[in-house]
Amino acid sequence: MADQLTEEQIAEF
């Protein structure tokens, strides 16, 4: 699902 999140959003996780 990483493809659906931006690098900024991934940083939160």
Curated annotation (Swiss-Prot):
Keywords: Acetylation, Calcium, Repeat. Disulfide bonds: none annotated. Residues 8-13 form the EF-hand domain. The modification N-acetylalanine is found at A2. The keyword Acetylation applies. The keyword Manganese does not apply. This protein has four functional calcium-binding sites. Calmodulin mediates the control of a large number of enzymes, ion channels and other proteins by Ca(2+). Among the enzymes to be stimulated by the calmodulin-Ca(2+) complex are a number of protein kinases and phosphatases. Belongs to the calmodulin family. This is Calmodulin. It comes from Tetrahymena thermophila.
